[in-house]
């Protein structure tokens, strides 16, 4: 007999579900949330949720208005989906069977949001249970959409298509795996292509959107249908539905990335088409998707040149699109002199901590740094427990009303495309926009003035050579625009001046710097205290950019700069405080010890310490403040000592509190999980302090910490978040370098955790980049510990070797991680060469290959010393790699090695190794000549008297 609910539990549960969405009665809402959390443990909970969600009418005995019952169903769907997400394996099979049979009924519901919720539950089941967990689902969805019988309602068709679109988006990889010799995509893709001709525009756009999900993955099923898809796109290009045309634009953009050869023959027609779509400004999203085409083609090595003949057509459209729309102006005007008004909660952007960049000692490059240097970033939405469609019923904020300055839009996309074109084509781009600039930079109407300044800023990097002759005239005019009556003009002028600050900073005579660079710097600094908060923000951001470009040459101006920063600390509201910290830390980063002059410390530190006392341990402002203090501590070095103790103690307290809250949330699901950024920034600041101070004071701080630092660090090293572990291993390595006696008693606990972290299998596919950053820092810290711990590493050598070999032998591992693993392996041989010698033949080749690209630093010297000491223990094991080793020795630059006692004897060890082989190998001179190049052989003979 089919499962049936009991009346009383159904009544209670439905009441709690209704109250959980009761925004006007917070007490009832909180009580309902507690009751629902407790109800999760009931074995039948998912049956009840399914029953409520899939029943179109309120079951007998439940007296709700249609609006109330809709809220009950919506909340039931969200809770059901979250239960499936977090506890799929614990759900009984008969409950899952009920869900699978009932939820698809909701795809036929008259209410669009209920159909959307059904799609969310369906895709969650597929994500957790796999394709084989519900094999009949895909054929059923495809049959509903296809409607071959003609009996399927329009709502059911659209509901099934929306559900299939979600399944495709959330399960890209598993749909392209083989099941019984067949890949689901092999039948899904042709069906999706056929659905793009459906009479319903919603189905056409969702079908094409689903195809777009797969294009970047290049699945075989799509590649074999690519010509059919292209024909389909050309058919749909003038579809009456703008949603469909939007997906057409996106498809062409995606195909650029995977098969540029398919785009090239059609480039002329595509240029005309994208221009036409971008000019449909009544649909900004469509226009923005069309503008993405220029950005993508412009950044494509094989295609960008194909746009050259059309620049005269494309660039005017980009310039048109960079003028604020009337709607944007209506939203943005009226900001006026708002500097004294407090920020609203929604004005304050979430700030996410950057975990300590991976310790790429090898060449001093920071892994994960932004390599392209672009000034335009698309910010994706943050994932949470809600999928698309789930929040729409209860969210009062309409995203379309978001501040146009805070979202990726047509104006920003067009400016980014102009930036890319400037980098690609250089002079022709500036020549094309010059008449526009001449007309509009002094335009009477501010939106045109503003757009011209934006255009000038957009071409700054690509066209700098052709713009430079005009800058002596342009820069003073831009500085005058900093006093424009319209705040948006002042705002964009700050940005553009920041983009040209590298020109000002590079002026090489005092007279030229006084004429251009100093007024530029002073103008931007002044705007940091504009009467408009957006202008303040732009001024601060531009000044951080100027600091970066000027580097250490800004040192003589530190005092007036810091005085202005201090005034900003007194005046800024919350939102701009975040970017002010960035200004301070950028100054500290580039001026370094120049910041440690007493008068500068006396100006800056009271302002920072005042904020330090004012900001609570729960405030998000703590993240940028801690990060800023990390840079300041590094710059001040020993001069940070007077401020170190309370800062260090508070970081320990924040870490302890965060770990306690996390453990409590694990034990009790009703409690919120704490924000791990508090851990990341606190760990990084501890690292900076330990590096900055004299070792004696660092040791005192570590010894006196309550709770004990290394007991807390153990928990952080086991944290599930990659960012936390990345910072933890950075701190572990710093402690090994600077406070090893305090660390040593804890190594028995910490080293096994470190070895566990070096397992490549611990990296999750979806977190591969941050996963490698953790392993990188773990390798680095292992190398630092090996130097200090010496023979104490002996019990761990076999496991460490196994881990290092797996890393060095994996082609997927990034170069910086390979280098740090090689350094750590070499350092292990400093005191443990005897037990490593028997394994030498297994690691000599990967070690020499990976260490080859490392600069001649102290790190390389220690690694080569350890490796050479291992060779001396087992010279015969090097037979196949002697040529590679002799080449490395011949080319070795000794400057850094001579600077420390640890590696001062490296050249003698090389000599000793060569002498040993000379005694072992007959006709050693002939042997060397047969193994390495003549110049390298001559080098060896000269340096080592062979």
Regions found by a protein language model. Name each.
Residues 1-946:
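Karyopherin-beta/Importin-beta family HEAT-repeat alpha-solenoid scaffold
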């Amino acid at each position: 007999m089919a499962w049936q609910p009991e009346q009383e539990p159904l009544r209670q549960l439905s009441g709690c579900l209704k109250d959980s969405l009761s925004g006007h009665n917070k007490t009832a809402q909180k009580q309902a949330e507690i009751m629902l959390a407790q109800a999760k443990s009931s074995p039948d909970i998912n049956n009840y949720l399914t029953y409520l969600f899939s029943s179109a009418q309120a079951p007998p005995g439940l007296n709700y208005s249609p609006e109330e019952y809709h809220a009950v169903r919506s909340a039931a769907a969200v809770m059901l989906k979250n239960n499936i997400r977090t506890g799929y394996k614990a759900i009984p099979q008969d409950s899952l069977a009920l869900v699978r049979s009932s939820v698809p009924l909701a795809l036929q519901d008259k209410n669009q949001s209920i159909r959307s919720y059904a799609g969310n539950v369906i895709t969650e089941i597929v994500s957790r249970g796999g394709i084989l967990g519900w094999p009949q689902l895909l054929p059923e969805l495809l049959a509903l959409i296809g409607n071959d019988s003609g009996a399927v309602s329009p709502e059911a068709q659209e509901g099934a298509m929306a559900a299939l679109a979600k399944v495709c988006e959330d399960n890209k990889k598993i749909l392209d795996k083989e099941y019984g010799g067949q890949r689901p995509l092999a039948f899904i893709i042709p069906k999706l292509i056929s659905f793009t001709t459906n009479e319903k525009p919603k189905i056409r756009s969702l079908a094409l959107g689903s195809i777009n999900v797969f294009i970047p993955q290049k699945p075989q099923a799509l590649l074999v249908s690519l010509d059919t898809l292209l024909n389909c796109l050309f058919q749909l290009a003038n579809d009456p539905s703008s949603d469909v045309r939007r997906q057409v634009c996106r498809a062409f953009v995606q195909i650029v990335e995977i098969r540029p050869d398919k785009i090239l023959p059609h480039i002329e027609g595509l240029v005309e088409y994208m221009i036409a779509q971008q000019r449909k400004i009544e649909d900004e999203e469509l226009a923005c998707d069309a503008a993405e085409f220029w950005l993508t083609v412009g950044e494509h090595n094989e295609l960008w040149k194909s746009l050259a003949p059309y620049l005269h057509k494309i660039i005017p459209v980009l310039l048109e699109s960079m003028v604020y729309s009337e709607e944007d102006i209506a939203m943005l005007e009226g900001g006026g002199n708002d500097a004294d008004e407090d920020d609203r909660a929604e004005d304050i952007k979430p700030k996410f901590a950057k975990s300590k960049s991976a310790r790429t000692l090898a060449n001093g490059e920071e892994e994960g740094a932004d390599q392209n240097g672009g000034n335009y970033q698309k910010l994706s939405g943050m994932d949470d427990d809600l999928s698309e469609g789930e929040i729409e019923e209860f969210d009062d904020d309409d995203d379309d009303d978001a501040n146009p300055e805070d979202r990726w839009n047509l104006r920003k996309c067009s400016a980014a495309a102009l930036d890319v074109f400037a980098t690609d084509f250089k002079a022709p781009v500036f020549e094309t926009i010059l008449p526009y600039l001449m007309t509009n930079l002094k335009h009477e109407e501010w939106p045109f003035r503003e757009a011209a300044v934006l255009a000038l800023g957009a071409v700054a990097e690509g066209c700098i050579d052709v713009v430079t002759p005009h800058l002596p005239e342009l820069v003073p005019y831009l500085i005058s625009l900093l006093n424009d009556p319209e705040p948006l003009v002042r705002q964009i002028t700050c940005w553009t001046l920041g983009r040209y600050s590298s020109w000002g900073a590079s002026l090489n005579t005092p007279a030229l710097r006084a004429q251009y660079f100093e007024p530029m710097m002073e103008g931007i600094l002044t705007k940091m205290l504009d009467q408009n908060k957006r202008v303040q923000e732009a001024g601060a951001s531009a000044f951080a950019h100027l600091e970066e470009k000027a580097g250490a040459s800004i040192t003589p101006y530190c005092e007036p700069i810091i005085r202005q920063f201090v005034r900003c600390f007194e005046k800024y509201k919350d939102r701009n405080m975040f970017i002010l910290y960035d200004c301070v830390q950028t100054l500290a980063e580039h001026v370094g010890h120049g910041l440690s002059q007493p008068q500068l410390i006396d100006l800056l530190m009271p302002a920072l310490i005042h904020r330090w006392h004012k900001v609570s341990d729960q405030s998000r402002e703590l993240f940028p403040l801690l990060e800023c203090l990390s840079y300041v501590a590094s710059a001040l070095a020993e001069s940070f000592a007077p401020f170190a103790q309370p800062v260090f103690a508070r970081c320990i307290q924040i870490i302890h509190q965060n770990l306690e809250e996390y453990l409590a949330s694990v034990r009790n699901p009703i409690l919120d999980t704490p924000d791990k950024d508090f851990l990341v920034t606190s760990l990084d600041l501890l690292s900076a302090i330990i590096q900055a101070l004299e070792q004696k004071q660092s040791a005192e701080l570590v010894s006196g910490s309550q709770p004990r630092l290394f007991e807390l660090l153990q928990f952080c090293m086991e944290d599930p978040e990659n960012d936390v572990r990345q910072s933890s291993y950075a701190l572990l390595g710093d402690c090994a370098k600077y406070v090893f006696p305090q660390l040593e008693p804890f190594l028995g606990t910490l080293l096994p955790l470190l070895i566990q972290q070096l397992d490549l299998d611990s990296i999750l596919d979806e977190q591969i980049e941050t996963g490698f950053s953790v392993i990188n820092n773990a390798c680095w810290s292992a190398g630092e510990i090996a130097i200090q711990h010496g023979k104490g590493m002996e019990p761990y050598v076999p496991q460490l070797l196994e881990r290092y070999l797996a890393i060095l032998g994996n082609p997927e591992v990034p170069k910086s991680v390979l280098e740090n693993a090689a350094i750590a392996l070499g350092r292990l041989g400093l005191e443990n060469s005897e037990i490593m010698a028997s394994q030498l033949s297994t690691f000599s080749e990967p070690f020499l290959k990976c260490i080859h690209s490392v600069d001649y630093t102290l790190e390389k010297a220690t690694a080569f010393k350890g490796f050479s000491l291992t060779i001396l223990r087992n010279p015969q094991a090097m037979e196949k790699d002697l040529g590679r080793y002799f080449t490395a020795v011949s080319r070795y630059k000794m400057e850094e090695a001579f600077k420390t006692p640890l590696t001062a004897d490296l050249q003698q060890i090389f000599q000793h190794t060569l002498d040993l082989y000379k005694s072992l190998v007959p006709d050693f001179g002939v042997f060397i000549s047969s193994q390495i190049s003549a110049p390298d052989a001559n080098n060896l003979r000269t340096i080592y008297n062979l």
